[in-house]
Amino acid sequence: MDAIGVAMTKDCFVRLPDLEVPMINSLVSCLTREHTKLDEQILQLALSAGRLAANPNDQEAGEHAREVWESIRRYLWSHLQIEDELVLTWGGAHHAIAHTLGETLESERQQMRKLLAAIGSHTDARGNASERERFAKSLLELSRMLATHVERYDGEVLPAIQRALFN
């Protein structure tokens, strides 16, 4: 009975690497497509937040900034979780990411979490002008941070993951 259990376990582990490469490659492709979509939304977010920051009394700008932020927020957490698992967990285990880059990514993620918490504290940008201005400035900072994130991931991080797949 133990021999059968070992054989079954061994067979499962033999097949896993055959599935791992297409699965990781698929995740990288999916993240790249999401980054393309996110890039467009980042631009919209920066423009609408800039408009709101310049004129905090502009109700239309405030509403548009909220709408763009909501469209990003809906999938941002799951996207970041997938990246964390793929890059920090799998990439770390397979030495795909240089130590200094890994530290940079973790620092970026901590800064992003703080900023997202700040945005969450004033998501109702219908308040007074100073609250709308703080909301707009937080969204501007988030758009800058997300643009840097997308550029780094598409140019450096995801290609490193793909190289690790085939080395």
Locate the predicted segments by residue.
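Small-residue-biased structural context
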Residues: 2-167
